[in-house]
Amino acid sequence: MPAVRYRMVTRRRRYRINGRRFYPLLALFIIFVILAILNKVQQKGLYANYSLAEVDPQHLEMYFDVEAAQGVPWYYLMAIDKAEDISAEEISPGRGEQLALHLRGITSPKELGEKLKEYNNDPNFIKRVEYEIKRLQYINEVYEDKVFPVAQVDYTYSNDFGNSRTYGGDRHHEGIDIMCEMGTPLLAVCDGVVEKKGWLELGGWRIGIRGDDGIYYYYAHLSRYEDGLEEGDRVKKGQVIGYAGDSGYGEEGTTGQFAPHLHFGMYERDSWSSAGEKAINPYPFLKAWERRSGQAN
């Protein structure tokens, strides 16, 4: 009689999703995530903020100047120009002054609506202005609450951003040179963290500070650093971080290739690509910070 083979039969347990419970919960979770994102966007305006790279630095300089002369926030003026789709050719100090005259006397944002009605009583226009103001708040964060990077002594500078340079190959100047005496104290323009410190062939002894506003502030050609300052340290606005010099354009320790000065650069993160950071013209900001610090030459 042949042997009987037995095969063990095991039952596989099947798990089924209770659709009546799962899908409503999934839908609620998705709605919660969407609402959280929208709330963050509404609070921060992240979806709409203009980057510094999107704004003409000459226009920005003009708006800052009109604010200083008339006491009207620069972003009100720029927001009106954008709401009216004013072309680049039409933007001018004269137009900015006229807009400021309509808005003079504003002491709080709540008064803006009434002033705008006197200028243009179109509800859609007023909403557009308010929307554009929100989009400009990131730039205003960079603009406000800063100090000039050179201590109050004799110095000179001009708008030499973008000028050609030849050392190390044909390139463009990515900052502003502030000519000053050797050893002039250099200041952190804002609160932030020391991100880079050390030698670069082009920049010599340099220090890079990531401001709390997200901008990378680049100081080059130093003669020396402030004692005890290291990468990762937090710095406060107005804190001495180093001293102007003439280092750079060669191997480590090279000096004397040019007159003492501070090369001051600003770099903005490109949040929409992996391109890294883009050099921004610091000139309009330097003029405004200098004026605010009472150092205007």
For each feature predicted by the language model, list its residue ranges:
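Acidic, glycine-rich catalytic/binding loops that coordinate metals and/or anionic ligands
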Residues: 146, 230-231, 236, 257-297
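Export/targeting segments at the very N-terminus of extracytoplasmic proteins
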Residues: 41-86, 142-148
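N-terminal Lys/Arg-rich, disordered targeting/topogenic segments
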Residues: 1-20
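Zn2+-dependent peptidoglycan hydrolase active-site motif and core
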Residues: 188-230, 250-261
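Hydrophobic membrane-insertion alpha-helices, especially the h-region
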Residues: 23-39
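Alpha-helical segment that forms one wall of the substrate-binding/catalytic cleft
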Residues: 58-68, 86-133, 192, 242
